[in-house]
From Swiss-Prot:
Family: Belongs to the class-II aminoacyl-tRNA synthetase family. Phe-tRNA synthetase alpha subunit type 1 subfamily.
GO biological process, one term: phenylalanyl-tRNA aminoacylation
Disulfide links within the chain: none
Binding-site positions, Mg(2+): E260
Top-rank taxon, per record: Bacteria
GO molecular function annotations of the record: ATP binding; magnesium ion binding; phenylalanine-tRNA ligase activity; tRNA binding
Presence of the UniProt keyword ATP-binding in the record: yes
Upper classification of the organism: Bacteria, Pseudomonadati, Pseudomonadota, Alphaproteobacteria, Hyphomicrobiales
PANTHER family with a match to the protein in the record: PHENYLALANINE--TRNA LIGASE, MITOCHONDRIAL, PHENYLALANYL-TRNA SYNTHETASE
GO CC terms, sorted: cytoplasm
Name of the featured protein: Phenylalanine--tRNA ligase alpha subunit
Pfam families, A to Z: Phe_tRNA-synt_N (PF02912), tRNA-synt_2d (PF01409)
């Protein structure tokens, strides 16, 4: 038994001293492998008398169990140590300067950048950001916004509908961010001043349209709100966004079910071969739609139109990003081409501010 105790002690010491998993495996094979020292002792049990086999077998198996447990514990310690070493080697100091190459540094997508620019501009004017779900109800997307039954926008070729529920309702992918305005008016009392950026969906795909696109809408509800306020907000936005000192705007009569009167807005521009200059030239370009919130919409949202008035506007984020940064094909924004993103994308630390410059 003294030889067995000595062997057990030597093996346990070797297990404890194993510097890595390879060395530990060598100890295991030397002790418990086919030709290992403990395995060799077990093979001698067949030559012993029953009384000796019972005594020696119990002692050898006890030693085997101790070695097995020690191997398992040491293997776990080595695994944890290896993981700690790997984590330490991969630690990144976030206070260090970022790498310079685009492939290593990454790029902010132009749409994300423009959404940040919009947020900075309207936040400076005192607007809050409101958000809502992409999957909407027919009531919020159409009915409460004064879309009568049978309106073309309700048809399948414009809207992505889901299967009807048991109660007969039919969810849909929102076709504009106007449902967020509805939810805002239902959840808070005037005065209201919000912008609603987000994804929208329509069955359309060509050079200037995609089935999923981004839109931002603005809403102001207050006593005495009028078109003069709307014109000032849009004018200040265009000057800040396109980074020009002055911009001439043209309001044309139009029709939207949720506003009355409704208008489309053009801004003065000069078209070059590969770019468009705003605030100069003798051409015009439509950029958004707007109008005074229809009294029916206010009523549907629990607001008295005899006390409060409001105005709203909406524009495509993808479209104004294309105009500002000279992107010719909307579909390229969603193709995931790293070369395209390296060219049109922004550095991660290019956070747009009015003081520091939106796109500098």
């Amino acid at each position: 038994m003294s030889d067995l105790a000595k062997l057990e002690s030597e093996i346990l010491s070797a297990v404890a001293a194993a510097p890595d998993e390879a060395a530990l495996e060598a100890v295991r094979v030397g002790a418990l492998g086919k030709k290992g020292s403990i395995s060799a002792l077990l093979s001698t049990l067949g030559k012993m008398s029953p009384e000796e086999r019972k005594t020696e077998g119990a002692a050898i198996n006890a030693a085997k169990d101790k070695v097995t447990a020690a191997l398992t514990a040491r293997r776990e310690v080595l695994k944890n140590a290896a993981l700690d070493a790997r984590l330490a080697s991969e630690t990144i100091d976030v206070t260090l300067p970022t790498r310079e190459t685009p492939a290593e540094q990454g790029r902010i997508h132009p749409i994300s950048q423009v959404m940040d620019e919009l947020t900075a501009i309207f936040a400076d004017m005192g607007f809050s950001i409101a958000e809502g779900p992409d999957i909407e109800t027919d009531d919020y997307n159409f009915t409460k916004l004064n879309f009568p039954e049978g309106h073309p926008a309700r048809e399948m070729h414009d809207t992505f509908f889901f299967n009807r529920k048991e109660d007969g309702s039919r969810p849909l992918l929102r076709t504009h961010t106007s449902p967020v305005q509805v939810r805002t008016m239902l959840s808070q009392q005037p005065p209201i001043r919000v912008i609603c950026p987000g994804r929208t969906y329509r069955c359309d795909s060509d050079q200037t349209h995609t089935p999923m696109f981004h839109q931002v809408e603005g809403l102001v509800i207050d006593k005495g709100s009028h078109l003069g306020h709307l014109k000032w907000i849009l004018s200040e936005f265009c000057k800040a966004f396109f980074e020009v000192d002055n911009v001439n705007m043209r309001f044309r009569p139009s029709f939207f079910p949720f506003t009355e009167p409704s208008m489309e807005v053009d801004i003065q521009c000069r078209r070059g071969k590969n770019d468009i200059r705003f605030g100069e030239g003798d051409d015009w370009l439509e950029i958004l739609g707007c109008g005074m919130v229809h009294p029916n919409v206010l009523k549907n949202c629990g607001i008295d139109p005899d006390v409060y008035q409001g105005f709203a506007w909406g524009m495509g984020i993808d479209r104004i990003a294309m105009l500002k940064y000279g992107i010719s094909d909307l579909r390229q924004m969603f193709e995931g081409d790293v070369r395209w993103l390296n060219h049109y994308g922004f550095k991660p630390l290019d956070v747009p501010t009015l003081a520091g410059g939106l796109s500098s």
